C-alpha cells in the first residue's frame, strides 16, 4: 500500500450518495460517497479508542487499506485535551487518519454507565464542529431485558429526538439508529419512522449485548424486522 496515498474527495453534490452495484436478495454490494472518498460496502469499520490505540489509525490506512473507521465523539468531548485538539485541528488530525471517520454519540456509554452528560443537540453540533464524515444522533439504548412498554418509550423518544438532530447536523451525514430491543414489532416501528427522515445511514442499535450473549436467533429476527422496513437506498450498519 502506498504510504503517501490520500483519499480522493467526492463532489459535494454526491456526499451521502449510495450506489448499489450488485445485489442478491437483501444482500447488497455498493459504493458510498463521502467527503473523504468513496467506500465500498459491505466493509468492516474498526473501532478506535482515541485514548488507547492498539493499532495506530495511520497504520490501518497505510498498511491494511482500511477505508473507514469509527471513533467515539463522546469520549473526545468528555476529555478536555482531546476536545480542544479536535476543535482546533479536526478529528482526522487528532487521530492521524485520512480516510472516512464515523463517530458514535455516547449512546453505548449510557448503556454501560447509566447516563451521559451531553445534550442531544450539543453532541451532534460537536461532531459537526470537529469535521466527522458521518455523525450519529444521541438515541435511546434499548436493553434486551427491558419490557415492551419500556422499549416502546425508548423508540418513541429516539424518534422525537431525530428531527432536531438532523437540523443541527446541517450538511453533515447523520446516522439514524434503529432501536426496538428484542421486539420485531418495535424494530419495524423504529425502522419505518427513521427511514422517513433524512438520514444517510441506519445502524441497527442495541445489538452488542445480544451478540455478547450469543443470541443469534434473536439477532436474525431483529435484522429481518429492521431491514425489511428500511429504505433500500441507504447503507445499514451493525
Language model features with spans:
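Glycine-rich phosphate/ribose-binding loops and adjacent secondary-structure elements
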Residues: 2-3, 168-238
Amino acid at each position: 500500500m502506498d504510504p503517501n496515498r490520500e483519499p480522493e474527495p467526492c463532489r459535494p453534490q454526491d456526499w451521502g450518495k449510495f450506489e448499489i452495484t450488485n445485489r442478491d436478495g437483501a444482500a447488497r454490494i455498493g459504493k458510498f460517497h463521502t467527503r473523504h472518498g468513496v467506500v465500498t460496502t459491505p466493509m468492516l469499520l474498526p473501532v478506535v479508542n482515541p485514548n488507547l490505540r492498539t493499532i495506530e489509525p495511520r497504520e490501518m490506512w497505510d498498511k491494511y487499506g482500511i477505508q473507514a473507521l469509527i471513533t467515539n465523539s463522546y469520549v473526545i468531548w468528555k476529555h478536555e485535551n482531546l476536545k480542544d485538539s479536535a476543535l482546533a485541528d479536526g478529528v482526522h488530525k487528532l487521530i492521524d487518519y485520512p480516510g472516512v471517520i464515523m463517530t458514535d454519540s455516547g449512546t453505548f456509554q449510557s448503556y454501560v454507565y447509566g447516563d451521559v452528560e451531553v445534550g442531544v443537540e450539543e453532541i451532534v453540533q460537536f461532531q459537526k464542529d470537529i469535521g466527522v464524515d458521518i455523525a450519529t444522533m444521541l438515541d435511546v439504548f434499548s436493553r434486551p431485558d427491558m419490557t415492551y412498554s419500556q422499549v416502546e418509550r425508548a423508540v418513541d423518544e429516539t424518534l422525537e429526538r431525530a428531527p432536531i438532530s438532523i437540523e443541527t447536523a446541517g450538511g453533515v451525514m447523520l446516522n439514524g439508529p434503529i432501536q426496538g430491543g428484542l421486539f420485531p414489532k418495535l424494530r419495524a416501528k423504529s425502522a419505518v419512522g427513521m427511514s422517513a427522515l433524512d438520514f444517510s445511514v441506519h445502524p441497527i442499535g442495541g445489538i452488542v449485548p445480544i451478540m455478547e450473549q450469543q443470541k443469534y436467533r434473536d439477532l436474525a429476527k431483529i435484522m429481518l424486522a429492521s431491514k425489511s422496513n428500511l429504505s433500500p437506498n441507504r447503507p445499514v450498519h451493525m
